[in-house]
């Protein structure tokens, strides 16, 4: 199970590169790739999917607004500050939405 500390560990490394405007460096790119993969793995995990089917997003229980557009934006601008910033924002939204979903799910099972 992916936890918040795994993201924070990568963010600590990436924030240093971001402050120096070096997100496009070879070392930073590896951290960004790892962060992006962790984000996608987390998305699959909370939706209980083996892979992401972008045509079936409306069937997933936890999907932030404009996910497809944001996903495409992150792919295009992954190594830019705004792409990294979007990843962090999406991660925070997924954590909150998943917590809410798990509570609703638990309450439904108790009724």
Give the positions of each predicted feature:
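Conserved nucleotidyltransferase catalytic core and NTase-mimicking acidic/glycine-rich helix/loop elements
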Residues: 2-109
């Amino acid at each position: 199970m992916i936890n918040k500390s795994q993201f924070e560990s990568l963010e600590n490394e990436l924030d240093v590169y971001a402050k120096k405007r070096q997100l496009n460096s070879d070392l930073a790119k590896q951290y960004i790739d790892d962060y992006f993969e962790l984000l996608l793995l987390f998305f699959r995990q909370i939706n209980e999917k083996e892979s992401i089917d972008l045509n079936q997003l409306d069937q997933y229980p936890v999907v932030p607004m404009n996910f497809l557009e944001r996903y495409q934006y992150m792919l295009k601008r992954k190594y830019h500050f705004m792409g990294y910033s979007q990843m962090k924002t999406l991660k925070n939204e997924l954590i909150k939405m998943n917590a809410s979903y798990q509570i609703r799910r638990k309450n439904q099972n108790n009724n």
